[in-house]
């Protein structure tokens, strides 16, 4: 009896060991490839929406009007994009995608948001004390933003049994910081059909 129990335990241990030896495969893929494993918001959604809305914003009348009346490129700050969807979406990656598109095109000038602006100011304060006078950056020379972009990410989920439809809507707005006027409003929608 004891020998049978030992044999059983040995076989059980070996079986579990073999099951644990399954190989995990990792493959490097292009960062701009679309891979959708779960049906949730992902990097491809963020990239596509950022590209579409950036192009829409940059090609709208507000930019040309500003250049015509001010004889310079507008300065934009990308502010808060609030996630109101049903899932955790890191809005910061989306905000950075928008900023990258703005900087990449060179059609507008972009200034830092409040968090990073404070870090830059701390560094400038340190320079006043620790850097040589020739290289210390002066106070009062920051570029003031003319426009601020902000928006929301929303979602609607409809499901029955193993099927689910998830609808995402990203709405962005651009406001003139001096007049509070909305100069551009647009949105992008994504709909995903998921079968589990």
Regions found by a protein language model. Give the residues of each.
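Sec-dependent bacterial lipoprotein signal peptides
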Residues: 1-21
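Bacterial Sec signal peptide processing site at the extreme N-terminus
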Residues: 15-40, 196
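Amphipathic beta-strand/beta-sheet edge segments enriched in Tyr/Trp
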Residues: 22-26, 146-196
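Short, secretory-pathway propeptide segments and organelle targeting presequences
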Residues: 30, 34, 41-47, 52, ...
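Extracytoplasmic/periplasmic, Sec-exported soluble proteins
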Residues: 38-49, 70, 86-90, 94, ...
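A short, terminal or domain-edge coil/loop segment
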Residues: 116-135, 159-177
